[in-house]
């Protein structure tokens, strides 16, 4: 496997002028093959750092690149963009390898050389931030190389590929470059259109023509599994670390959807989870007719897709040693819709919590009542509310409702808003009727953000907005405040 040094910062116009580069150069930047001499890159960096103010010793090694895809498909290259981000990327399509090199000594030398050039340009030309090329993303040393992969790739795409892309025929199609589609999983044209096609990308004063081969779709599918795209900022999150980050976007902090199993793992102590009614499944009580797909077949397909039997998981577990009854809805299963089985499982959970004198947690994530079950799904609202009435008023026990995105419809109108303490996640979409339904029914525009957790909190709709990383500790403190203690602590007090 060959190793290449890729320096896209040479596209800075001022640097081209200093080094006598040709602005019409049709490549992404200087590339040198370090396959022959592994120490060559260190030597070049040293000579670059000690250059005088009007010359650049590395210009002798420049040559053009006609097809960047050749390097992406089976080679390794080191990248430093004009924003100051430096990183080494290894691609191996055949073996599905995509990783970042962990060479901190090389990073420090490489960055210092780029930053010294930037400071030199500031002094000589009087730049003070008005040049858009110098709005750099500084490397944050608190992240390891692997955790920094997302911001590096995103910075590279923004600065090199996604700035201004157009098809040679003249039609505008921004952000549709080969690398962007390969990482984001965008749609690829069919093979007959791909063969021999080309695209010109303008990157800050220079033109790059990228040839697309007929197997773009194959490459796209191979790398699609590596990333999760944020639905708020559209930033890319490396899937390998996404679960450890609790499905929170590293770019903007947005809380993305989370499966019920992941939420149980987040809240319940390991080895203490005891599920309830796992074998309870939905039938077709009203023989719902659908031209697209029968209701039973749809249930079966979601069961295979999610590994769940229904849109809620219920059970008993321990939260920091405190026994709790918990139900977690899963939006991935038919939009978390509430049918007869969901209502029955939650009702049984409440009754068991009342009998065993346990605090109750219900994590809501639902689109509302399930239309395929008609009035049977609507009656679950009254059934669950009746069970909660006995639990809260007669048994005097403690119920915490956690509203996640989205929580709408019948769940919002029933047990979602009946908690003694109502907690919402940041940025959660919480409503009775959705924005589209309201606008179509009333023919009025719903203000942006009027159904977001932050706005509703100001109106007093719930008690707390708690980020995921603090949720378990906040719940633990609430339970202790209401005289629910860990098992070992409770037994020691009795003695």
Curated annotation (Swiss-Prot):
Instruction: Give the record's pathway.
Output: Lipid metabolism; malonyl-CoA biosynthesis; malonyl-CoA from acetyl-CoA: step 1/1
Q: Molecular function (GO) terms listed? A: acetyl-CoA carboxylase activity; ATP binding; carboxyl- or carbamoyltransferase activity; zinc ion binding
Write out the ranges of the annotated region (Disordered): 188-208
- Tell me the GO BP annotations in alphabetical order: fatty acid biosynthetic process; malonyl-CoA biosynthetic process
Q: What cofactors are annotated for this protein? A: Zn(2+)
- EC number(s) stated in the UniProt entry for this protein: 2.1.3.15
Q: What is its main location?
A: plastid
Catalytic activity, reaction form? N(6)-carboxybiotinyl-L-lysyl-[protein] + acetyl-CoA = N(6)-biotinyl-L-lysyl-[protein] + malonyl-CoA
Pfam assignment, any one: Carboxyl_trans
Enzyme class, broadest EC rank: transferase
- Binding-site residues, Zn(2+): 230, 233, 249, 252
What does this protein's UniProt record list under function? Component of the acetyl coenzyme A carboxylase (ACC) complex. Biotin carboxylase (BC) catalyzes the carboxylation of biotin on its carrier protein (BCCP) and then the CO(2) group is transferred by the transcarboxylase to acetyl-CoA to form malonyl-CoA.
> What family name appears in the similarity comment?
Belongs to the AccD/PCCB family.
Task: State what protein this is by name.
Answer: Acetyl-coenzyme A carboxylase carboxyl transferase subunit beta, chloroplastic
């Amino acid at each position: 496997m060959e190793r290449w040094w890729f320096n896209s910062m040479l596209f800075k116009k001022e640097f081209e002028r200093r080094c006598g580069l040709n602005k019409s150069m049709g490549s992404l930047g200087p590339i040198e093959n370090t396959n022959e001499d592994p120490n060559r890159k260190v030597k070049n960096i040293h000579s670059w750092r000690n250059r005088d103010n009007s010359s650049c010793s590395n210009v002798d090694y420049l040559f053009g690149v006609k097809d960047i895809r050749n390097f992406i498909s089976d080679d390794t290259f080191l990248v430093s963009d004009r924003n100051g981000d430096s990183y080494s990327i290894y691609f191996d399509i055949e073996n599905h390898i995509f990783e970042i090199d962990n060479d901190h000594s090389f990073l420090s030398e490489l960055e210092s050389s780029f930053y010294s050039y930037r400071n030199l340009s500031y002094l000589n030309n009087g730049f003070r931030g008005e040049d858009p090329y110098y709005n750099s993303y500084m490397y944050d040393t608190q992240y390891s190389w692997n955790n920094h992969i997302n911001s590096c790739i995103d910075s590279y795409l923004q600065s090199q590929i996604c700035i201004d892309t157009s098809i040679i025929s003249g039609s505008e199609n921004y952000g549709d470059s080969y690398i962007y589609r390969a990482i984001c999983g965008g749609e690829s044209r069919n093979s007959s259109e791909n063969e021999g096609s080309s695209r010109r990308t303008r990157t800050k004063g220079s033109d790059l023509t990228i040839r697309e081969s007929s197997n773009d779709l194959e490459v796209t599918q191979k790398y699609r599994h590596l990333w999760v795209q944020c639905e708020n900022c559209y930033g890319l999150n490396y899937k390998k670390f996404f679960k450890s980050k609790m499905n929170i976007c590293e770019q903007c902090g947005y809380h993305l959807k989370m499966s019920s199993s992941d939420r149980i793992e987040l809240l319940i102590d390991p080895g203490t989870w005891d599920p309830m009614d796992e074998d309870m499944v939905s039938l077709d009580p009203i023989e719902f007719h659908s031209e697209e797909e029968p209701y039973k077949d749809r249930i079966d397909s979601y069961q295979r897709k999610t590994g769940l039997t229904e849109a809620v998981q219920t059970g008993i577990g321990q939260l920091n040693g405190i026994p709790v009854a918990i139900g977690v809805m899963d939006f991935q299963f038919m939009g978390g819709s509430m049918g007869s089985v969901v209502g029955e499982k939650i009702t049984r959970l409440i009754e068991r919590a009342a009998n065993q004198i346990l605090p109750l947690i219900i994590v809501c994530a639902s689109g509302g009542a399930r239309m395929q079950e008609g009035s049977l799904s609507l009656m679950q609202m009254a059934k669950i509310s009746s069970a909660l009435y006995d639990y809260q008023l007669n048994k005097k026990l403690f119920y915490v409702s956690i509203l996640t995105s989205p929580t709408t419809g019948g769940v919002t109108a029933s047990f979602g808003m009946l908690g003694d303490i109502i907690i919402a996640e940041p940025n959660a979409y919480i409503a009775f009727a959705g924005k589209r339904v309201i606008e179509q029914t009333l023919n009025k525009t719903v203000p942006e953000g009027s159904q977001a957790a932050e706005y509703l909190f100001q109106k007093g709709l719930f008690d707390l907005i708690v980020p995921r990383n603090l949720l378990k500790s906040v719940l633990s403190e609430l339970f202790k405040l209401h005289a629910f203690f860990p098992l070992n602590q409770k037994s020691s007090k009795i003695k």
